[in-house]
Amino acid sequence: MGAHLVRRYLGDASVEPDPLQMPTFPPDYGFPERKEREMVATQQEMMDAQLRLQLRDYCAHHLIRLLKCKRDSFPNFLACKQERHDWDYCEHRDYVMRMKEFERERRLLQRKKRREKKAAELAKGQGPGEVDPKVAL
């Protein structure tokens, strides 16, 4: 995800979303049937598993299962391959989804800027097909 840094510093920063901030557009904008993502693991389960704050994400339920498996089969560290795979795959899907959300936010910001520019041109009287009076003379 380094391309956003280059576009942010060298390109137009007004249409590039800040990756550290929450999205400015509602998640169901353009998707009326879209459901909100829900955490599978509850706050109490994450506290009981003593997960650090950095690990409390949408894949925490897989991590809790992995840590439990590691604890239950301690000497045999290879016994938890499936749990590890499930957690890694969930983290990958979460990363891809966040990148898609970032790209969606960037495109919506570009669209908003284009619409504002078009509205400003129409308000000035220089819409498509119209000629500025100074140019017509």
Curated annotation (Swiss-Prot):
Q: Which PANTHER family does UniProt cross-reference here? A: NADH DEHYDROGENASE [UBIQUINONE] 1 BETA SUBCOMPLEX SUBUNIT 7, NADH:UBIQUINONE OXIDOREDUCTASE B18-LIKE SUBUNIT
Main localization is: mitochondrion
UniProt membrane topology term: Peripheral membrane protein
What PROSITE patterns does the database record attribute to this sequence?
CHCH
Signal recorded as keyword = no
Give me the ranges of the annotated region Disordered: 113-137
Pfam families, per database record: NDUF_B7
Compartments, as annotated in UniProt: Mitochondrion inner membrane; Mitochondrion intermembrane space
Q: Where is this motif: Cx9C motif 2?
A: 80-90
Q: Where is the lipid attached (N-myristoyl glycine)?
A: 2
- State any GO BP term from the record: mitochondrial electron transport, NADH to ubiquinone
Tell me which GO cellular component terms the UniProt record holds: mitochondrial inner membrane; mitochondrial intermembrane space; mitochondrion; respiratory chain complex I
Q: What is this protein called?
A: NADH dehydrogenase [ubiquinone] 1 beta subcomplex subunit 7
What organism is this sequence from? Homo sapiens (Human)
Q: How does it assemble?
A: Complex I is composed of 45 different subunits.
Keywords, A to Z, come to: Disulfide bond, Electron transport, Lipoprotein, Membrane, Mitochondrion, Mitochondrion inner membrane, Myristate, Phosphoprotein, Primary mitochondrial disease, Respiratory chain, Transport
Q: Which family does it belong to?
A: Belongs to the complex I NDUFB7 subunit family.
Q: Name one GO molecular function term.
A: NADH dehydrogenase (ubiquinone) activity
List, for all copies, the residue spans of the domain called CHCH. Answer: 56-98
| Comment field on protein domains | Contains two C-X9-C motifs that are predicted to form a helix-coil-helix structure, permitting the formation of intramolecular disulfide bonds.
Connected disease: Mitochondrial complex I deficiency, nuclear type 39: A form of mitochondrial complex I deficiency, the most common biochemical signature of mitochondrial disorders, a group of highly heterogeneous conditions characterized by defective oxidative phosphorylation, which collectively affects 1 in 5-10000 live births. Clinical disorders have variable severity, ranging from lethal neonatal disease to adult-onset neurodegenerative disorders.
